[in-house]
């Protein structure tokens, strides 16, 4: 059975989007061009992984340009910075908050964060294909019909 949703990119946003869609019952395929998920997470905060910030959401949004803040505001209110921390700590990650409000893993390794996010994907039944760059998003009649990868077209109605 083909996926209902294909998510392109297994960075933080792609991982969370895939996991949440699968939680809501969708058959999800997550495509990543790199040989592992979370490549950008692994280098965030100098490899220590600045998970999020402890501030209020509106304070966080002020750090973005106005157009960016308008774009991400709805997603930030649907899945808050505090929920991200709870998601990780509920799986055993210990975190601490620096005086500037940035939240990091106690053991200062992004690998732990990526491993926990990977466990959420597996638990939700998300299919992950690594080393699979997307060539293009395929359209017919103004509608998405799939994504093209090296092996051919993966049919799906949502990307």
Positions of predicted regions on the chain:
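Conserved N-terminal/central alpha/beta ligand/cofactor-binding core
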Residues: 33-127
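Hydrophobic anchor at the start of a short beta-strand
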Residues: 26-29, 95, 159
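Hydrophobic/aromatic ligand-binding patch that stacks against planar heteroaromatic rings
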Residues: 16, 20-21, 33, 40-41, ...
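Predominantly flavin-linked oxidoreductase catalytic cores and closely associated redox partners
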Residues: 43, 110-159
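N-terminal Rossmann-like FAD-binding beta1-loop-alpha1 element of flavoenzymes
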Residues: 3-30
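Short glycine-rich loop/turn motifs that provide flexible caps or phosphate-binding loops at active sites
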Residues: 8-13, 37, 44-46, 145
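Anionic group-transfer/hydrolysis microenvironments
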Residues: 6, 34, 133
